[in-house]
Amino acid sequence: MASSADANQETIGAGLAPPPATDPPAGEAGESQVQTDLGQVEYLAVGHISVDIFEKRYILGGSASYAALTARQLGQQVGILTSADFEPLLVDTLVGRDQMLEPETPIRILRVPTQSTTMYVNEYDEHGRTQYLLGRAADLRPVHVPEEWKSAPIVHLAPLAQEIEPGLLHTFPGSLMLITPQGWMRGWDQDGKVYPVTWEYADEALARADVVIFSTDDLPVPSLIAEYGRKARVMVVTENRRGCLVYERDKAPWRSHAFRPAREIDPTGAGDVFAASYATQYHRTGNPRAAADFANAAASFVLEKRAWQGIPTVQAVNDRLKRGKRRGA
């Protein structure tokens, strides 16, 4: 699952404020919340948006950001419950004023006030990537959820830095719940250096979730895949160009092959687009196989452009499902 932190520097200009020169703060939630426009939503993404630093540029990141943009592009009314010290560029992107995505329906944002926005930076050397957490926004708790959002048809818990409290697992009793647990598999030291950790609330989350999606790169202990697969109702493990493996309870896992993009430019956000597309189609059809094919087709478009500029419409995805070529099929 490609991280949105890996976006190309051309995606967004350097219009954001620089990160704080302090150790990662825990973030304190305020008594009030700032939002654009509330009301009923069909797809609720819960998790930190982030400012990711790439080649001295500050860019929009976070699974919640990409998932929300995807759900909006697929025709849903979308809300985000997050915590951040909003910079204007982030708001412009999420509510649609950047004119880069259609439709123009604004994403409804509820923000828990905090002193800092979650920020990641990646450093690369001959040994690979080292990731640092430079700032962290406030934790997200059940008390932050407005009453009208508790009945959202789809709820996507998308932790980025251990910010989602486990009580949120039980705040949406009638919703289809998607969990992308990447941010529950990260820890960091006093210098902000990120390292893998075991998913602390895995049993509780797997018991509640309708769908769990992560990549083979996210899991610190690969042997846990089979264990999680036995406990989950539906679990999808993405494998980049190989597509994904789908685990249904009491069934053998099966593969949905990836679609070939017209060109390959940037994988940023492909995993997040896959997840939101899967949940959207699974909610519409109830068919885990059809949802996997739909999500693979949607994710293939993301590779063709920079970051969220490649997020497709439903019509484009359906056309690729009919006419697209698949890897390994």
Regions found by a protein language model. Give the residues of each.
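Short hydrophobic/aromatic-enriched beta-strand-loop microsegments
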Residues: R108-I109, M177-P181, M235-V237, R255-H257
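Histidine-anchored nucleotide/phosphate-binding helix
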Residues: G62-Q73
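Conserved N-terminal subdomain of the carbohydrate kinase-like
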Residues: Q35-E42, V51-R57, Q73-E163, L168-L178, ...
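Conserved phosphate-binding/catalytic region of the ribokinase-like
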Residues: A2-N8, I12-G13, A17, G30-G39, ...
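Active-site metal-binding loops of divalent metal-dependent hydrolases
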Residues: G47-I49, V273
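Charged helix-capping and loop-helix junction motifs
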Residues: L60-A64, K193-E200, F259-R260
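Conserved beta-alpha-beta core of the PfkB/ribokinase-like small-molecule kinase fold
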Residues: I154-E227, A232, R242-G243
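Short beta-strand scaffold segments in enzyme catalytic cores
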Residues: L69, Y120-N122, C244-Y247
